[in-house]
């Protein structure tokens, strides 16, 4: 029985769930007493979320709401990379949140090395923004999945496994 079992490791998120979470945030901003009249705007573009509001205090409140709604929609808050706060025209502040998606080559190599160092009978290959983990034993693959859960905290990126064969 020389059959190989495998799974893929990706760093991804459900964009529709993110859109739904941001819609809930916009609704809450318009309804909350402390945020009414703050002229807060929330815009989602390809890989960025732009928040513009009157003060840093309001900005921090909006960021907290974004985190809460993302968690409720089963999105990892590790997908958010918060850039520095900019002061724009007048008294307004703006923050850009970059959305992390995909494994870059550097992190993929580190994860691959960590898996191979821990579990000797396993093969890991890098395919673009995904890692393919292969082994003849399903038990080794299950150990690799447990190891990936720990590496997720180490590298501060969301990792998912799919295509388990």
Swiss-Prot record:
InterPro entries in UniProt:
DUF520 (IPR007551), UPF0234-like_C (IPR035571), UPF0234_N (IPR035570), YajQ-like_sf (IPR036183)
A molecular-function term among this protein's GO annotations: nucleotide binding
By what name is this protein known? Answer: Nucleotide-binding protein PMM0481
* Swiss-Prot/TrEMBL keywords: Nucleotide-binding
Transmembrane stretches, start-end: none
Checking NCBIfam families in the record gives: PRK05412.1 (NF003819)
Extent of the signal sequence? none
Q: Which PANTHER family match?
A: UPF0234 PROTEIN YAJQ (PTHR30476:SF0)
Organism, by scientific name, is: Prochlorococcus marinus subsp. pastoris (strain CCMP1986 / NIES-2087 / MED4)
Task: Tell me the function of this protein.
Answer: Nucleotide-binding protein.
Q: Which Pfam families match?
A: DUF520
The UniProt entry's sequence similarity note says: Belongs to the YajQ family.
* GO cellular component annotations of the record: cytosol
User: Highest taxon of the source?
Assistant: Bacteria
């Amino acid at each position: 029985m020389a059959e190989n079992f495998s799974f893929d490791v990706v760093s991804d998120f459900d964009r529709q769930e993110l859109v739904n979470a941001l819609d809930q945030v916009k609704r809450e901003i318009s309804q909350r007493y402390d945020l009414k009249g703050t002229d807060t705007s929330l815009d989602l573009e390809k890989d960025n979320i732009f928040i513009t509001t009157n003060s840093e205090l309001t900005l921090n409140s909006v960021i907290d709401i974004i985190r809460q709604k993302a968690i409720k929609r089963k999105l990892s808050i590790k997908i958010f990379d918060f850039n520095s706060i900019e002061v724009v025209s007048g008294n307004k502040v703006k923050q850009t949140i970059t959305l992390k998606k995909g494994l870059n080559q550097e992190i993929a190599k580190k994860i691959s090395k960590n898996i191979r160092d821990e579990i000797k009978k396993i093969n890991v290959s890098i395919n673009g923004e995904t890692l393919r983990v292969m082994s003849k034993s399903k038990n080794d693959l299950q150990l690799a999945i447990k190891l990936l859960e720990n590496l997720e905290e180490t590298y501060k990126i969301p990792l998912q496994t799919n295509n388990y064969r």
